[in-house]
A protein has these predicted regions:
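Ligand-binding beta-strand-loop-alpha-helix segment within the catalytic cores
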Residues: 3-24, 84-208
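Gly/Ser/Thr-rich active-site loops/lids in small-molecule metabolic enzymes
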Residues: 222-252, 296-311, 636
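Histidine-anchored nucleotide/phosphate-binding helix
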Residues: 67-95, 413-436
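N-terminal glycine-/serine-/threonine-rich phosphate-binding loop
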Residues: 1-56, 72-80, 86-87, 93-94, ...
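ATP/nucleoside-binding phosphotransfer catalytic cores, i.e., glycine-rich phosphate-binding loops
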Residues: 2-7, 24-25, 264-362
Length: 772
């Protein structure tokens, strides 16, 4: 269908250089997340100018960060020339300032039950960022306040549903006890409330402007995969993908797995025939679900297809999210080697055909690859040679080099490319440094650290922690022999002594407590441990911890990182914990500060003087937000250093892991992974990253620890290259390293200049966008 775009949409669509979308729901592609936020903001303001008393429904979570920032910035600086220019350049009429105070707001969804005053409730988010942030009238807001949802017996929800476990099957079955009867009546009361909420939305005339994200399973609001397209407001259980995504909000998968949600339905969104429905998505992790949602006919397995009958439906996408769509660039002359290889890989997959059997006819018969210039008999041969070169590079790893391995979080480096590190650390001629940029405290659950403190208390009382009796321990002894802690712990791993491992971990916990709180005696130590345990018992899961608790959790993760690289024989003096200050556990992460965040990186690079710097490379800015902010920080440090000294010989190795990955065309180095390397990864991860062993914050792709997902990714990447090069390339190879290959690690190699050019696009889009 030919899309009828508004003036704002036309302005952004023209910049994408794409033909008119052929999907049933039109889409617009932008370069990055900040531009995605600008597009959604300007389209929202454009609609409010035409509908100043309309009904809006806006999203929660991290996705709308730049939508919120842009909207607040534009409205706060409406009369400034730079804002007027931004609006005019992007199709928004500036003759009249939008006023939002007469709009009616409908909350999309909420966890149930949840205290609305908690910072991780969507009710809190809506109040803070929309009612207060946008100046909406609270009297015009229809919100989901869990504490005000009635139950028929006027008891607390926790008394009715112990541990907040709600069994919705009680709707349909007989009860077996008095408590189940109470629960059944309460569920019916919630159902009644949901029905009344739906009616209130209908009384407003339905939703006029809906903006929402799309979940990994395709969920719109909390309408998960399989939801009826005629669904209305209701309480429901979610699926694993949604629970994994919600784990960071609720304090772990252990909580989100049992927490229900209240959500408006798909028909609630589309009931108003004039509704504007915008779904926005960023990053390649969303590319597959975006493709299915736009290119498959109406299907309950893809909730967004329910929107296809609404003429006002749109998808706003970053390049990464639009990556798999069958789109054709207007400028057919812009075929880089990488782009040619990317499309030929897609063609092999679509045809399920080995690359060596790809013919010029196959290439010419495909709508997209037929546009590749100068197609001939050598096209596929050249393609295969370029793929082989990426693999051959793995045989030429550096010797007598200094490598600075950097990670945004603890475990990022291990999960990114540990088989490469196996080879780098084998040579005593190489010097390896490891630096983790943030303290990583958000991935440690309250329950885990509380249990660890209880074990520590038991060991102190049973006199199993002898070091605290040394006369100088509370003065400076606590800060000594940390390397010995690590060595002894790994000794206990070798001897399979789990008690010894726990004791070693508690030793490090004691050192951290004395360090953080400047404790001076055993009595003070015991009191402080009891105080912290009491704190954890009184706070809710997912609550933002105070700085001292954040530091305690972070120091636990730092010990885990030291264990990991000591596992590989690295001296802990070569392991750096930078604790960059922008990482605070806020809903929206701060922009890195030059003095606070950049200078420590400059100091580290000057101190280590590396030949190679590794980093988590997210060129679109749509991976985990911390990854992106760390990339910004390292880029700025290198930009400053490049002005002070020659950095031309320094190589950058970009890696990705469980959150985001390279495709086979953009990777420069493909490193073989043997079954032995996979076993080492799993053993290292489960023995060293103890707080992550239970996978409290899993990826939506796998219900288990990250090491298992990493192995799956490596195997999938190898499977792609088996298709391209043929299986015989591997099992008949003359090199035993390749014959033993069952997975592949992808890396991208850049010069500092090339990296800065990549990072500058990101840096300019944020720093130069006026909204920091």
């Amino acid at each position: 269908m030919k899309a009828k775009f508004t003036n704002v949409e036309k302005a952004f669509f023209s910049k994408s250089h794409l033909n008119n979308p052929r999907t049933k729901i039109p889409y617009i592609q932008v370069d990055n997340i900040p531009n995605l936020g600008l597009l959604t903001s300007l389209r929202f303001l454009e609609w409010t100018l035409e509908n100043p008393r309309g009904v809006i429904s806006l999203p929660t979570g991290k996705t709308p960060e730049y939508f919120i920032k842009w909207t607040q910035y534009i409205l706060s600086n409406w009369d400034k020339p730079e804002v007027e220019q931004i609006c005019k350049d992007n199709g928004l009429n500036t003759n009249k300032k939008p006023k939002l105070n007469h709009l009616k707001f409908v909350q999309i969804d909420e966890f149930y039950p949840i205290n609305p005053l908690q910072h991780n409730s969507f009710y809190y988010f809506v109040q803070k960022f929309y009612v207060e942030g946008f100046g909406l009238n609270p009297k015009n807001s229809l919100l989901i306040n869990s504490s005000e949802i009635p139950n028929s017996i006027n008891e607390s929800i926790e008394d009715i549903f112990p541990n907040y476990k709600i069994d919705l099957s009680l709707r349909y079955r007989d009860t077996n006890s008095d408590i189940e009867e109470k629960q059944k009546q309460t569920i019916f009361a919630i159902d009644q409330w949901c029905s009344e909420y739906e009616n209130k939305i209908a009384d407003l005339g339905g939703i006029g402007f809906f903006l929402g994200g799309i979940g990994p399973d395709g969920h719109i609001a909390f309408n998960v995969r399989g939801s009826d397209h005629n669904s209305t407001t209701r309480i429901l259980e979610t699926n694993f993908e949604t629970q994994a995504t919600s784990a960071s909000d609720l304090g772990g998968i252990e909580i989100s797995r049992n927490r229900l949600v209240i959500t408006i339905g798909l028909s609630t969104i589309t009931k108003n025939s004039d509704v504007i429905v915008i779904i926005f998505a960023a990053g390649r992790s969303k590319a597959k679900i975006v493709k299915d949602s736009l290119e498959i006919k109406k299907d309950i397995n893809f909730p967004a297809t329910a929107l296809s009958d609404s003429i006002g439906s749109r998808f706003y996408l970053t390049k990464g999210a639009a990556y798999l769509l069958n789109k054709i660039n207007i400028n057919t002359k812009d075929w880089s080697t990488e782009e040619i290889n990317r499309e030929l890989i897609k063609l092999c997959k679509n045809l399920n055909k080995f690359g060596s059997r790809l013919t010029p006819k196959d290439i010419m018969d495909n709508q997209i690859t037929s546009s590749i210039p100068n197609i001939n008999n050598n096209t596929s041969t050249r393609f295969l040679d370029q793929m082989k070169q990426k693999i051959q590079k793995s045989s030429d790893l550096p010797m007598n080099n200094t490598i600075l391995h950097t990670g945004p979080h603890h475990d990022d480096i291990l999960l990114g490319y540990s088989p490469v590190i196996n080879h780098l650390v084998r040579s005593a001629e190489n010097t390896n440094y490891f630096a983790v940029m943030t303290s990583g405290f958000t991935s440690v659950t309250n329950k885990y650290i509380s249990n660890l403190l209880s074990k520590t208390l038991e060991l102190i009382k049973s006199e199993k922690i002898q070091m605290i009796k040394y006369p100088d321990f509370f003065d400076n002894g606590f800060n000594l022999k940390k390397a010995k802690d690590v060595y002894h712990y790994l000794d206990k791993v070798a001897s399979q002594n789990t008690f010894g491992q726990t004791r070693g971990l508690c030793h490090r916990m004691v050192r951290s407590l004395v360090d953080i709180y400047s404790l001076k005696s055993i009595d003070e130590l015991v009191v402080k441990i009891n105080d912290i345990i009491q704190y954890f018992s009184s706070c809710y899961d997912g609550e933002k911890n105070p700085p001292d608790i954040q530091k305690l959790k972070g120091m636990l993760r730092e010990f885990e990182e030291e264990l990991t690289w000591a596992h590989y024989g690295v001296d802990i003096k070569n392991i750096y914990h930078l604790r960059l200050g922008f990482y605070k556990g806020d809903i929206f992460t701060e922009t890195p500060d030059r003095e606070r965040d950049i200078k420590p990186i400059i100091k580290l690079i000057n101190k280590t003087n590396p030949d190679i710097i590794t980093l988590a490379l997210d060129p679109e800015g749509s991976g985990p937000d911390t990854h992106y902010k760390v990339l910004q920080s390292i880029a700025e440090a290198l930009r400053i250093l490049s002005k002070e000294k020659d950095m031309s010989k320094v190589k950058i190795w970009g890696y990705r892991n469980v959150w985001y990955r390279f495709d086979s065309a953009e990777a420069d180095i493909m490193f073989p992974v043997s079954l032995n390397s996979m076993a080492v990864l799993r053993d290292s991860f489960l023995n060293c990253y103890l707080s992550q062993k239970d996978a409290s914050f899993p990826s939506y792709e796998l219900d288990g620890p990250f090491c298992d997902l990493t192995q799956k990714i490596w195997v999938d990447q190898h499977r792609t290259m088996e298709l391209i090069l043929g299986k015989d390339f591997w099992y008949q190879n003359n090199d035993p390293h390749f014959r033993a290959t069952h997975g592949l690690v992808y890396l991208k190699e850049l010069t500092v200049k090339e990296f800065l050019n990549t990072a500058r696009t990101l840096e300019e889009s944020i720093e130069g966008s006026l909204i920091k």
